[in-house]
Amino acid sequence: MNAAVISPKRLLESWRTHRLLILTVVFLIFGILSPLIAKLMPELLKGGLGGIKVAVPKPTSLDAWTQYYKNITQMGIYVFALMLGGCVSQEIQQGTLVNLVTKGLPRWTVIVGKAIVGMLLWIWITSLAFLVTWAYTAYYFPDTRSPHVVLAFLPLLVFGLFFLSLIVFGSTLATNNYGGLLLTIVVMALLYLAQMVKSWQHANPVALIGDNMKILVNSDALTKLMPAMVIAVVAAVVLFFAAIKLLDRKKL
């Protein structure tokens, strides 16, 4: 039994535990709401000012995409972490890995299986929200102010690999679901603090979810993020490898 065999079982497990369904619904809502909120925001602002006349700029496609990236990076990634936070620790607690290991399953395939399924989930939910936002944005705001929507989306996918590796590593290291989630939040907080250092900004994985709007209007901005993308991928490989080593030493 190897990772290629175990991955379909992990996908089925995600469906049975409603993890896939919950993530799909949440991110679908993000996709629908992002352009809708941008469309309604001027009216909401006018209504909240109690009749005071204020010049509110007409919303554009940029407002819809700004809302999309805010929803994904400020809420979506943490919903994802919450759903997958116990992906390893929970199975160790429940003893479900014991039978697999006694049947000859190498422990490394558990981590690789989690990585494959987790990345498939990330690609699915972010792409779903992206496509829905794109469709509604094209309908509500048929302008040309957002020429590079696909390029702006690519760093988000790469960040997902890094973020997933952090979740899997934390879940393997921790003895419970909350420990792994806490580690993920702490590391993210440290990365956000590091982003305040100007010389580190283009090498920080957090930049992959912070500079998307710059890429949206100027494709050259993607080149500046190459160091962050490389570091994110390398860090992900290191964290997955570390998770494998940790699981090898864990008592199941």
What are the residue ranges of the model-derived segments?
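Hydrophobic alpha-helical segments typical of transmembrane helices
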Residues: 64, 84, 95-96, 208
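Short hydrophobic, aromatic-rich alpha-helical segments embedded in or entering the lipid bilayer
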Residues: 5, 199-218
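Helix-loop-helix units of permease transmembrane domains in multi-pass membrane transporters
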Residues: 87-119
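Secretory targeting signals
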Residues: 27-87, 112-184, 192, 214-233
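Junction motif at the cytosolic side of a transmembrane helix
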Residues: 234-252
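Transmembrane helix-loop junction
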Residues: 13, 90, 103, 134, ...
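Aromatic- and glycine-rich beta-strand/loop motifs that create alpha-glucan
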Residues: 1-28
